[in-house]
UniProtKB/Swiss-Prot annotation:
Gene assigned in the entry: moaA
HAMAP family given in the database record: MoaA_B
Taxonomy, superkingdom: Bacteria
Name assigned to this protein: GTP 3',8-cyclase
Native source organism of the sequence: Bacillus velezensis (strain DSM 23117 / BGSC 10A6 / LMG 26770 / FZB42) (Bacillus amyloliquefaciens subsp. plantarum)
Binding, [4Fe-4S] cluster 2: C265, C268, C282
Length: 341
């Protein structure tokens, strides 16, 4: 068995460096831009347990991505990852993998008061919490379940108290929550957490995306600069998706993820593994590659490694660049709740 780490690049010379694992397609929220309640109702056919990759299967795949391809970062997503039973057990398995330097999780934060300490003890390093408003009634409307913003704020504080790194992501939509840009910036500036604004993206097929509803990075930063001046700073690492800005008074930083106005396809090094076990090479992909079938089909680690490498070598995705060139109209895409953000 060949256990040597090798560099694999795609058709555009982009290396594989980052793995995102969706552990469930279920969520306890029904956010309008991700899992709108009218489409994801009580009769929606969510994946059954046997359809999900088991923790042992996920561990095996993670070991290959880290040991064979040199992946150093794994992010756990959903749906809402904490809806998957016994998540600390999966994190323990991942934390034992030699060479894996960073284990992160994207979550809506509502279950962190229960799980934050257990996640930290298991080996999780940091969380990114999705929060789109501090105004309670607006937040309840956005999450579609009437969950109070206080529940998420409690989760953020629980994560901080447990010693987890914390960042906040806010999806900004014109006509929905642009009034929250400044209150969110002020609040998390005072709390000492990095807030990242995300341009409203056309992920999936159900969020009624229209470019007119996008508030761009330039507009967001211009608004903040009028009240709390910032200056741009360099990325932490090659391929970082957020543009970083530092407050001039030295009180921290913010970021903007601007997939619509600034395509970052050229440096994208992320592979995404869905809860069903399909490998996707782009957040905006139409289809994935059935890795679960290979895992359950008796392939050796060497054979599985070569199959994954072949998928990456043939990757040509550059959806955000194509969008800017109006080459994506009518393209059907996988839903974000299935592939993870």
């Amino acid at each position: 068995m060949n256990t040597e780490t090798r560099r694999v690049t795609d058709k555009r010379e982009r290396p594989l460096r980052d793995l995102r694992i969706s552990v469930t397609d279920r969520c306890n929220f029904r956010c309008t831009y991700c899992m709108p309640a009218e489409l994801f109702g009580p009769d929606y056919p969510f994946l059954q347990k046997t359809e999900l990759l088991s923790f042992e299967e996920l561990e095996r795949l993670a070991k290959l991505f880290v040991g064979r391809f040199g992946v150093e970062k794994i992010r756990l997503t959903g749906g809402e990852p904490l809806m998957r039973k016994d998540m600390p057990e999966l994190i323990k398995k991942l934390a034992r993998i030699p060479g894996l330097k960073d284990i992160a999780m994207t979550t809506n934060g509502s279950l962190l008061p229960v799980y934050a300490e257990k996640l930290k003890q298991a080996g999780l390093h940091r969380v990114t919490v999705s929060l789109d408003s501090l105004e309670d009634e607006r937040f309840k409307a956005i999450n579609g379940r009437g969950v109070s913003v206080n529940k998420v704020l409690e989760g953020i504080e629980a994560a901080k108290a447990a010693g987890l790194g914390v960042k906040i992501n806010m999806v900004v939509q014109k006509g929905v929550n642009e009034k929250d840009i400044l209150p969110m910036a002020r609040y998390f500036k005072e709390k000492g957490h990095i807030l990242r604004f995300i341009e409203f993206m056309d992920v999936g097929n159900t969020n009624q995306w229209n470019k007119k509803d996008v508030i761009t990075k330039a507009e967001i930063i211009d608004l903040i600069n009028q009240h709390m001046p910032t200056e741009p700073i360099e990325a932490n690492y090659k391929g970082e998706v957020a543009s970083r800005f530092r407050y001039l008074d030295g009180s921290g930083e913010i970021g903007v993820i601007s997939s619509v106005s600034d395509a970052f396809c050229a440096s994208c090094n992320r592979a995404r593994l869905s809860a069903r076990g399909e490998l996707f090479t782009c957040l905006f992909a139409s289809s994935g590659y059935d890795v679960r079938k290979l895992v359950r089909g008796g392939l050796t680690d060497d054979e599985l490694t070569e199959s994954i490498a072949s998928v990456w070598r043939n990757r040509t995705d550059q959806y955000s660049i194509d969008r800017a060139l109006s080459k994506t109209d009518g393209k059907k895409k996988v839903e974000m709740s299935y592939i993870g953000g």
